[in-house]
Amino acid sequence: MGSCYSRKNKVSTISLDEEEKKKEKKKKKKIYILNGASGSGKDTQCRLLEKKYNYKIICISKLLKEYKEEYNKENVLNEEENYFDEIEKCMIDGSLVNDQIVIEIFHKQLNKYINDDKYNGIIINGFPRNYEQALLIIQNNISITKFINIQVGKDTLWTRINNRIIDPITNISYNENIIQIIKKKREGQELSDKEQKQLIIDNHLYNNLSNDILERLTKRKDDEEQVFNKRFQLYIESEQKINSLFKNICKNVDGEKSINDIFDQICSIIDDNPN
């Protein structure tokens, strides 16, 4: 009888230890913000980081759609009922969702992923976008591990955007010059040493592209210089205010370098903050 009691007690202790480990893991889950202007390569870096670290990538536009799909007016709190109409309206007319609503939904969905053992950490892609959103993050006591800022000059940003084409189905962007090199190679044409080197550098991003994907790639309608200039100016004005709130945890990355070099810089920041 004493032996049975001891075995049960042992199982109970193990169970408690496992629960404590789970709680500790959730408490230690790192949250990084990846900041940068349009064309700085945030999406590309997020895909690479997601694969290496098994992190959940949070993008606000996708988060709002996800929230709308997961919930309905019957299963949310009363104060959230008007969120659906607001999100629906903004999705239709292209306007911005109210900052307070964005933060409320962001906080709710963020907690879901913090408590999900499937992910080792979280990377927030390109959010907050303005000072008000950044301030709300601080006021809601959302603990950010590091604010990683990809710094790229205006001329480089415009060159990248001008050479950017996207997959309209996945919304993944690619470099048009590299796509042309891939097409040239598949057509059996001889590549220059420079073109061969470019394919080797970016092979991990482009080697699985099917011919169907290559054919449907297209330019974004808003990738025009006038639109870019306006967005860049707004970004610069917001960045200075946002960075002031995260100055103690801000780490700058040289975004003028290659994709792999930028990735190594970001990985170094993450690896300096182990769980």
Swiss-Prot record:
Which leading EC class covers this enzyme?
transferase
* InterPro entries to which the protein is assigned, alphabetical: Adenylat/UMP-CMP_kin (IPR000850), P-loop_NTPase (IPR027417)
Q: How is it modified after translation?
A: Myristoylation is required for cell membrane localization.
Region (LID) residue ranges read 165-214
Signal sequence residues: none
* Xref: CDD domains: ADK (cd01428)
Asked if Lipoprotein is a keyword of the record, the answer is yes
A GO molecular function term, named singly, is:
ATP binding
Q: Which reaction does it catalyse?
A: AMP + ATP = 2 ADP
Name of the protein this chain belongs to: Adenylate kinase 2
Q: Which organism is it from?
A: Plasmodium falciparum (isolate 3D7)
